[in-house]
């Protein structure tokens, strides 16, 4: 046993040397910056656990919110109506079952794509294009006139008499703020005796007066004072928006009032919820919406700055690429060759204008108001640029308007005509959308030229039924973009020609047929 002791001590000493060597190696490894694998693994396990807990918590909140919305939308067919008056009309149900818009907290798609460096580079390319337009404008002015100055004549002309347009907006907004809510309050009273009938009749009269104010006042002011296009655009967009919001508020609340049995009254929704609805970026009324915890004012300022940048971009495009081409076109003899060349020339500016309108309004403007009001659901559009069919393009281009058309035109059409009349209901959606789009163009430009009506209703309707969701693949996406390019070129070319033809060939007196007859077909001074 004696000889084994030194051997054991020798092994212990060897073990201590190995341990010291290991510690020394660890120190050297730390000195040279090599990560400790065990500590790195533990750190990654902690990060994974934290991430899974956060994802599970957010998913649970999302499912709870979706379940709550589904319970609110579930038709109470087999349940008796409550004997007591409910606290709000948000818990009443529609007269017929159907899909309802569910609002959840989510970011806009472009905000998500901006987190990717490759997409930010595309955004930077558009900014570089604006810089090139500014530099080219300065260079041309310096060469031709010997001065360096950016003129914003087109922008100043377009927004002329803007204070008058804003003053006209005030009674339009006050009418929308007071009349629908007061009418609902009159209808929600207990139905007993002739007092309720008198109040209901008074509510109908108020709604008729409200419709007259919204429909007649902006048209009268625009025609009488000859407002320029951008000021008219403010009025017509607010006119259509307030009409759609008024209809949505009454459509979502009135059925619950008239479903109450026994002549008992019902509490209308709170006035604050209606006031919030008038400003939040949605056309579907709900008494509550998902809200974000705080307001990012730098995000609001950035979006408004981008709106201003898009306005400048559009003015430079029109001033540099459209005005020089179409200003004197009506002075020349008409030829098919000149018309085709003008349409092809206008495809580039037209698609640029489409992208600028989309980014400025559907992304920047709506996100700015959503952030100021802490409105959580930012899905104002979807990835329409990836569409392989025009049916998908129409659904994803403007989700805000599509939700309104789907809820109150398509679904109500199916309820009135039956589930088999899907084609008729879809045609009704196209007809309403085409007429409103043509009305907006007629209001803004000051003349009737049904280019948008024909493109939207005829060609758009045919493409919607022929290029449907069954077609997939990159070839169909290329075809969709080709039709978009051509459609924008046709619109820009024909509307610009008509605009300058009415300036070069004014009528001796204003008549109805003179307003609705295209002047560019006969104006060749």
From Swiss-Prot:
Residues 1-119, 188-199, 256-296, 373-420, 468-473 are cytoplasmic. It is an enzyme of class 2 (transferase). Residues 9-23 have a biased composition (Basic and acidic residues). A motif (FYXDWWN motif) lies at residues 380-386. The chain crosses the membrane at residues 120-141, 162-187, 200-223, 232-255, 297-329, 347-372, 421-445, 452-467, 474-505. The keyword Transmembrane applies. Its main location: endoplasmic reticulum. Disruption phenotype: Mice are more susceptible to high-fat diet-induced insulin resistance. The keyword Membrane applies. An acyl-CoA binds at residues 392, 395, 398, 402, 410, 433. The active site is at 437. Its EC number is 2.3.1.26. There is a cross-link at residue 280 (Glycyl cysteine thioester (Cys-Gly) (interchain with G-Cter in ubiquitin)). GO terms for molecular function: cholesterol binding; cholesterol O-acyltransferase activity; fatty-acyl-CoA binding; sterol O-acyltransferase activity. Belongs to the membrane-bound acyltransferase family. Sterol o-acyltransferase subfamily. Catalyzes the formation of fatty acid-cholesterol esters, which are less soluble in membranes than cholesterol. Plays a role in lipoprotein assembly and dietary cholesterol absorption. Utilizes oleoyl-CoA ((9Z)-octadecenoyl-CoA) and linolenoyl-CoA ((9Z,12Z,15Z)-octadecatrienoyl-CoA) as substrates. May provide cholesteryl esters for lipoprotein secretion from hepatocytes and intestinal mucosa. Each protomer consists of 9 transmembrane segments, which enclose a cytosolic tunnel and a transmembrane tunnel that converge at the predicted catalytic site: acyl-CoA enters the active site through the cytosolic tunnel, whereas cholesterol enters from the side through the transmembrane tunnel. This is Sterol O-acyltransferase 2. It comes from Mus musculus. The lineage of its organism: Eukaryota, Metazoa, Chordata, Craniata, Vertebrata. The gene is Soat2.
């Amino acid at each position: 046993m004696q000889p084994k002791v030194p051997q054991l001590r020798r092994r212990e000493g060897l073990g201590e040397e190995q341990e010291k060597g290991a510690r020394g190696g660890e120190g050297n490894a730390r000195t040279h910056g090599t990560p400790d694998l065990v500590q790195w693994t533990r750190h990654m396990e902690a990060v994974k656990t934290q991430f899974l807990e956060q994802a599970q918590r957010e998913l649970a909140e999302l499912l709870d919110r979706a379940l709550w919305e589904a319970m609110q939308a579930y038709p109470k067919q087999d349940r008796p109506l409550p004997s007591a008056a409910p606290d709000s009309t948000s818990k009443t149900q529609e007269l017929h079952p159907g899909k309802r818009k569910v609002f959840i907290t989510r970011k806009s798609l472009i905000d998500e794509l901006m987190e990717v460096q490759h997409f930010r580079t595309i955004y930077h390319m558009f900014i570089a294009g604006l810089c090139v337009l500014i530099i080219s404008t300065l260079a041309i002015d310096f060469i031709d006139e010997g001065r360096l100055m950016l003129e914003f004549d087109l922008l100043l002309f377009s927004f002329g008499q803007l204070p008058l347009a804003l003053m006209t907006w005030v009674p339009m907004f006050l009418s929308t703020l007071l009349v629908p809510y007061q009418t609902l309050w009159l209808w929600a009273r207990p139905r007993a005796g002739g007092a309720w009938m008198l109040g209901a009749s008074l509510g109908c009269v108020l709604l008729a007066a409200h419709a007259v104010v919204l429909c007649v006042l902006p048209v009268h002011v625009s025609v009488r004072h000859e407002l320029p296009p951008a000021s008219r655009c403010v009025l017509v967009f607010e006119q259509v928006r307030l009409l759609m919001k008024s209809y949505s508020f009454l459509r979502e609340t009135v059925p619950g009032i008239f479903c109450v049995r026994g002549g008992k009254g019902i509490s209308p929704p709170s006035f604050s919820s209606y006031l919030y609805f008038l400003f939040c970026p949605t056309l579907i009324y709900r008494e509550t919406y998902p809200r974000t915890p705080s307001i990012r004012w730098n995000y609001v300022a950035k979006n408004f700055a981008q709106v201003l940048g898009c306005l400048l971009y559009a003015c430079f495009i029109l001033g540099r690429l459209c005005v020089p081409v179409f200003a004197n076109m009506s002075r020349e003899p008409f030829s098919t060759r000149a018309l085709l060349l003008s349409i092809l020339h206008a495809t580039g500016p037209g698609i640029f204008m489409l992208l600028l309108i989309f980014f400025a309004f559907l992304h920047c403007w709506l996100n700015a108001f959503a952030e100021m009001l802490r409105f959580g659901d930012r899905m104002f559009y979807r990835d329409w640029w990836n569409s392989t069919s025009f049916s998908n393009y129409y659904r994803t281009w403007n989700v805000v308007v599509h939700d309104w058309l789907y809820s109150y035109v398509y679904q109500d059409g199916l309820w009135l005509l039956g589930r088999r009349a899907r084609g008729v209901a879809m045609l009704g959606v196209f007809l309403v959308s085409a007429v409103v789009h043509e009305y907006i163009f007629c209001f803004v430009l000051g003349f009737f030229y049904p280019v948008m009506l024909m493109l939207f209703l005829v060609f758009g309707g045919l493409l919607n039924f022929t290029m449907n969701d069954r077609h997939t693949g990159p070839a169909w996406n290329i075809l969709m973009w080709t039709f978009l390019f051509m459609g924008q070129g046709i619109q820009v070319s024909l509307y610009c020609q008509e605009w300058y033809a009415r300036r070069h060939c004014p009528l001796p007196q204003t008549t109805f047929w003179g307003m609705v007859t295209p002047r560019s077909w006969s104006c060749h001074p």
